Amino acid sequence: MDKKKAAAQSRAGKVEKTRLKIVEAAAACFIAKGFHQSSMRDIATLAGVSLGNLYNHFENKAELINGLAELEAQENAVLLRLLEDTGSPTSTFHTFIERYFTMVRAPDNAALTAEIFSEAMRNDAIYQIFDENRQSLIQALNGLLIAGQKAGDFKSDPLIPSLTPLILDLIEASALRIALAGGEGAKAEGKLLQSVIDLWVKA
């Protein structure tokens, strides 16, 4: 490999690592202090970078929100790959519900989700950023439900795929409630969640 090319790749890797460190620090600050109470200096200090270095990567907290959305997209990529497995629609569907419920109810994820939801209600640009990730999940889950209908696993009702946003809403609301309760009752809640959603869609 050309030395200049190798050096450029090394620099790019360092930049990406620094950006990730800053975004993770921003997430920690938002969870601990809230979006508005967290300053760029707070984030720089937690990330272990100078304030000037932080501004080299992100001009403001809105850009940091974009970084958080990118991290969420990376987490969701695992779920999207799962939903592509239409060989056994019911099994894939149940696995998705379990994994998404577990992911959302994780204490840090739940706290950050609540903070972002609060800010998104006041800032449409932030809402749009995270809605893109949600729409990707909706489309992938729609595809699984349609595959399940063709396989006879799910009800043939043409309205079934339109339930996808409601399914995500139910999982998220249930997960956040469990997170608020400190995780108590998570196992029972997960089973109940599966049963309720099965009533909606299973043939």
Annotate each predicted stretch with a short phrase:
Residues 127-131, 135, 149-196:
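Hydrophobic/aromatic-rich alpha-helical bundle segments in the mid-to-C-terminal region
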Residues 83, 98-104, 112-122, 195-200:
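Helix-loop "lid/cap" segments that line or gate small-molecule binding pockets
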Residues 67, 81-110, 160-167, 190:
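Hydrophobic alpha-helical connector segments
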